């Protein structure tokens, strides 16, 4: 991870300690931080439901920064509720909302350069 670039991005988007969660192996920007970045860059996101079932959902997000409307990014978010984390990746029954949240986060992080630095 390029620490200098990461510090530069934190300052650019005015991220505070409560906007970031440091996991043992990686850094996670909280929902509050994601929305702060989205607002600052004026990122527009539309969603397409690819699959939505009782315990599984996939959303496709199309996103762009308003100052660069020709650069459209497409990415996905998914959530699977299973018996445990070995079989799934979500511990709640609101899998559609989790898939949407994951698609949103991934799109914002990719458009702003965080994702390539290992921030999720």
Sequence positions of predicted segments:
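Polyanion-binding surfaces on beta-sheet-dominated domains and ring/shell assemblies
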Residues: 1-120
């Amino acid at each position: 991870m390029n620490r200098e670039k990461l510090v530069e991005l934190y300052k650019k988007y005015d991220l505070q300690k409560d906007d970031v969660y440091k996991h043992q192996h990686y850094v996670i920007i909280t929902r509050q931080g994601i929305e702060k970045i989205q607002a600052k860059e004026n990122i527009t996101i539309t969603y397409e439901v690819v699959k939505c079932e009782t315990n599984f959902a996939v959303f496709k997000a199309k996103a762009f920064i308003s100052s660069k409307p020709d650069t459209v990014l497409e990415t996905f978010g998914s959530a699977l509720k299973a018996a445990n984390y070995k079989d799934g990746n979500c511990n709640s029954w609101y899998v559609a909302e989790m898939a949407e949240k994951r698609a949103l986060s991934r799109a914002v992080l990719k458009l702003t350069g965080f994702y390539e630095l290992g921030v999720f």
